[in-house]
A protein has these predicted regions:
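His-enriched metal-coordination microenvironments in redox/metal-binding proteins
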Residues: 1-7, 27-33
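Short, surface-exposed coil-to-beta transition loops
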Residues: 2-6, 19, 84-86
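Short acidic-glycine loop/turn motifs at beta-strand connectors
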Residues: 11-18, 92-96
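Low-complexity intrinsically disordered segments
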Residues: 41-147
Length: 147
């Protein structure tokens, strides 16, 4: 098996689709992982309405989770492996999946418990990189002037 590949892309107004900023995932490209990455980005305070900025921070969240030096790439849609035989393309806007391409008509799923465990694990891998207070299941942005 080659991986669990996916591309996450976002449309920027005034820019042709082929130049849309995109993230390539070699692993963790299933819908539960992508939705968990997006949820964690929101919890971690990423400005999800600013497409280019939020894609950069989403890339950071994913890279912190994956670790190492492989398994993730960035570029424009035209240069991505969009029809990859795994999960295809997730088009996102404001931190939500709004469209799919090349998904082969199937979606990976996770139970609520599996999804919550994945979110917790992603947050654990990211908590030292973002100004967020973690108290059990509660997350709160830190006020930099508090401490």
């Amino acid at each position: 098996i080659m991986g669990n590949r996916a591309v996450i892309s976002t449309k920027v107004e005034g820019i042709p689709k082929k130049y849309s900023p995109s993230i390539y995932l070699h692993w963790n490209g299933g819908r539960p992982s992508v939705e968990a990455f997006l949820k964690c980005a929101k919890i971690l305070g990423v400005r999800l309405g600013d497409n280019q900025y939020s894609l950069a921070r989403l890339c950071q969240v994913i890279s912190n989770f994956l670790g190492g030096t492989l398994s993730i790439g960035v570029g424009v849609y035209a240069n991505m492996d969009t029809d990859n035989g795994d999960n295809g393309v997730y088009w996102i806007k404001n931190g939500k999946i709004v469209k799919r391409e090349f998904d082969g008509g199937h979606e990976q799923t996770a139970t609520d418990e599996e999804f919550d465990e994945l979110v917790d694990y992603i947050l654990e891998k990211n908590k030292s990189h973002f100004p967020v207070k973690f108290t059990g299941k509660e997350y709160q942005l830190k006020n930099e002037w508090e401490e």
